[in-house]
Amino acid sequence: MMPHPVQLGKKTRMSYSQIDEVLEMPNLIDLQKDSYQWFLDEGLKEVFDDVSPIEDYTGNLILEFVDYSLDENPKYNIEDSKERDVTYAAPLKVKVRLINKTTGEVKEQEVFMGDFPLMTDTGTFIINGAERVIVNQLVRSPGVYYSREFDKTGKQLFSATVIPNRGAWLEYETDSNDIVSVRIDRTRKQPVTVLLRALGYGSDAQIKELLGEDERLLATLEKDSTKTTDEALLEIYKKLRPGEPPTVENAKSLLRTLFFDPKRYDLAKVGRYKFNKKLSLANRILGKKAAANIVDPSTGEILVEEGTKIDRETSIMVQDSGINEVFIYAEDNKVIKVLGNHFVNINKHIPFNIEELKISDKVYYPVLKEILDTFSQEEDIRDALKERAKELSPKHIIIADIIASISYEFNLAHDTGNIDDIDHLGNRRSRSVGELLQNQFRIGLSRMERVVKERMTIQDVDLATPQALINIRPVAAAIKEFFGSSQLSQFMDQNNPLSELTHKRRLSALGPGGLSRERAGFEVRDVHNSHYGRMCPIETPEGPNIGLINTLSTYARVNEYGFIESPYRKVDKKRGVVTNVIEYLTADEEDLLVIAQANEPLDEEGRFVNKRIACRMQFGAIDIAPANEVDYMDVSPKQVVSVATAMIPFLENDDANRALMGANMQRQAVPLLITDAPIIGTGMEYQSAKDSGVVILAKHDGVIDRLSSNEIVIKRDKDGQKDRYKLLKFKRSNQGTCINQRPIVSKGERVKAGDVIADGPSTNQGEIALGRNCLIGFMTWEGYNYEDAILINEKLVKEDSLTSIHIEEYEAEARDTKLGPEEITRDIPNVGEEALKDLDERGIIRIGAEVQSGDILVGKVTPKGETELTAEERLLRAIFGEKAREVRDTSLKVPHGESGIIVDIKVFSRENGDELPPGVNELVRAYIAQKRKINVGDKMAGRHGNKGVISRVLPAEDMPFLADGTPLEIVLNPLGVPSRMNIGQVLEVHLGLAAKSLGWNVATPVFDGANEHDIMDALEMAGFSRSGKVKLYDGRTGEPFDNDVTVGYMYMLKLHHLVDDKIHARSTGPYSLVTQQPLGGKAQFGGQRFGEMEVWALEAYGAAHTLQEILTVKSDDVVGRVKTYECIVKGENIPEPGVPESFKVLIKELQSLCLDVKVLTEEDSEIEIKESVEDDSGELSIEYGDLTYEADGELEIIEPAEEEQDTDVDYITEDDFESPDPEIDFDEKYLEDDFNSYDDF
């Protein structure tokens, strides 16, 4: 098949796709934006309505929340917020009304309720200057869940859980003796009949009448010791509140607050929907035979005759006629009674449209009947419905729900009803930003409510105003805590546009109210058939979070209940035509349907070509179905996978494990200096770049009026107004990569609204460009490809093909100390002019200076503590005036192993009116940019999970070359392909070779791209052999290699794991306080761990002296290491090692256990172990980096805080809690690091 051209932005790609796109892909970050918008429009209102009105205990004062508004113009815009380390937020103002019932006085005031963080256009929040993302959480949906277990004899035991959104759980279980018991709110279990009696069905006869005679019910009644409603209430009260005196009144009010108080028990919209779905009569009698005539209660008409099988339409008709109990024949031909929860479809009973009443379709029939019996006029009915909306679809559980759930439990034993799969996406829902925020806001408001009630009782009634009663601290604190430290509020992964996009579409099962890593078993993590088209089966992290953190599929969306929906094309069964009508289905709805795949061939009219079609049948089974039975068809082959996975060409030819690595590694690619869009793309590149928010889009149609490297001005067509677009230049991302935008339009060019006018990081002509197209060959070369190592051409280094810019931020702050303020100055003690050459008169480095490690960035001095003066000195001081105050140098210096060019300086000071943390007078930030060329030790990868480390950079003249003299750019190991089964990379290389020489850019979409024949045809067109192999020559000898080699273009990424960030060496440095051993890790400037097994190795070789010095003078023999240093400096012989500090610690530990431990010589005389360092260490100062260890008599050891130069005070800042990997929260990050000992803390 010949590819056809497709226009993507400014680029034309040759597409191999055969399936027409019926539905455009939705905006990929709408998920976040829509949810936040819902919160501002409706979510906030719901919370205020729930809390309002607040009454005091006497019922005299009433506080109502009338209205709220968010100020449109925040104090700082997005840029300023990032620069000043503040939160991008707008003030929330609430109109509050206070009513005094006795005097009838009404006071109304607008109350400021704190600053509310705003979402940026790209779906992120800026909290304390850092961009953060709130990820979506997957939680168990509220509802009624039934499960089955088998006892030792193989008998089925059913159990059930009734889960609300918030409130007490109800759990039913059947034991081997057929007794059904209930647990209320996780307390001890009791017979289920006790609960029924407490709900008003007091006698045995009433209960049997209610549920029908069932052997389980009779067994339970036998076990039940209570006989009346009052006894049952007391029995429940004793179990729930042991130790409190039980009274019937208390018991009643306890049950009322537990289940029937909307403030305590909330099903939420989704809970009511799930309850009605599970417990409705219609679903339970469907397909069963009626055991008695079913009669319409209002007309007396027989709806179903005895012995008739009930179909779907009849079952719904029976339910909507208000019938709530039906006798049916079970599978075992017993007659059983089925009880629903008495909800009906309101539209069947009311002739007019009720949309504007905002009542849900399903309503509680007894209340509806009462309204219809009382009123006959439409207006009256409308008003009554409005007034009793809360009773019609109650937010809390009602008695009918409880009885229906118990009836279901009894019916299950007779094979009536289904058990639930809790990993099914119909039973898991997504909580997005809006809902998470709403929950947090609700917590804050309920805390505030308590405060308001207390203040109402204390304050003078006449003087009370809304402002005086309301304390906004709890609300502000709840919001701040959520954004600052919730597990779901994560530091945005800003490596490249794709990683930003994916982060916003992440679904996490962890977090508050979710699962924990330890408890999650295999089932929760596994791919489920309901994930199809909703959650990507490929993209998930490797490691402890596998399967718990997922990504939304490309076309999926979240509905109002939080369930994930996937779009399908409707099949018109009458005509047998696949229409272009799109319907979104949840996993529940899909389970009952027959769905064809997107690549099923259709003719011109949209009819299926084949008579028998491979489909997904009921409950996810794959089977062949006749064409006339198909209900829906997939929209696109891409709908199964996520955005990152859809960017892997030939995904269908890769093993799933490697595809997972490929999808994850694309997110780790560093933006390169010279971007290069892939020759072999999938057609997803344009949309993902556009939606990620890193490129600039034109807001209106117009003409480019003027443009420079940092601004584009467009003259609008409509009204001639000018739109200005500011471009970001060399800004630092969260991960230290470089954000730089550049225009891709020219003056006078016409643009349409939504066109890309400027490229961002990792984009090229509006397409995502994460790496570079490299000419590669699959062959071995002198063992340099062993174990996936990569051999590269020096040309890539020289031409900056794989060079990236990295920007680091360093800050110095001048604080107030006890001895006086610190000062930022150029006047630093004991520093030569050479070191100050790049500092300006303030002592701050100039922009453009080139710095190496150890150079001063910001000169700063701190007052030194002065000793107590003697009387004579004080007298002299008084006569001759103040001697210069003693200060020490605490300048900010470039840390070890870092260097680069200063690209930006920011100075904030109190005097200029900047907001600074308490105790800070001045804050200076310096930004150092580094150009990092590709280097030995850097990690590179393709898009198919084929990763490796660069082992050697070879001169171009030594690289293998093609017949025309072109040297290869990269040599990869052919052995990396077969065992890994990622054949996609080979196809990519073949097609890349052909496309490059034909001058094509190719789009080969996943599951709908080029096949082997297409690739061979393309190779033939380009004049290559159909095998795709070519003759290669050795660059050193010029001889041809024995065999032909696969050569072509592969898209290679340079990953974030760069050798410059990892390589590290230490001379002398900080030591741990207790054990006196060197710290570990690059951040602490630590040493190399010499562990137990390394000691064995030296012991095995008998290297006694080496071993002794490693365990003593190179580690924790405090005196010995100082003396050794001294001897090396003076050129003397190294002294005998002393006793290691850890040995002394061990002895102390044993002594603390009351063991008298002594060290004896061979002659049994005791060896005295000195407690502290004696004066014989002399005066010595060890310098390393920017920390000076002065040993004046006793050795003073200073421990640096992580990357903090100010050794005097160790301040903990918020950044210390920032985790670089959004999937590890900070407490675990420290547990996972392999520190030498706990004392490093």
UniProtKB/Swiss-Prot annotation:
UniProt-listed PROSITE patterns: RNA_POL_BETA (PS01166)
GO cellular component, one term: DNA-directed RNA polymerase complex
EC class (word): transferase
Keywords assigned: DNA-directed RNA polymerase, Nucleotidyltransferase, Transcription, Transferase
Catalytic activity: RNA(n) + a ribonucleoside 5'-triphosphate = RNA(n+1) + diphosphate
InterPro entries: DNA-dir_RNA_pol_bsu_external_1 (IPR019462), DNA-dir_RNA_pol_su2 (IPR015712), DNA-dir_RNAP_su2_dom (IPR007120), DNA-dir_RNAP_su2_hyb_sf (IPR037033), RNA_pol_bsu_bac (IPR010243), RNA_pol_bsu_CS (IPR007121), RNA_pol_bsu_protrusion (IPR007644), RNA_pol_Rpb2_2 (IPR007642)
BP term (GO), one: DNA-templated transcription
HAMAP family (alphabetical): RNApol_bact_RpoB
Stated name of the protein: DNA-directed RNA polymerase subunit beta
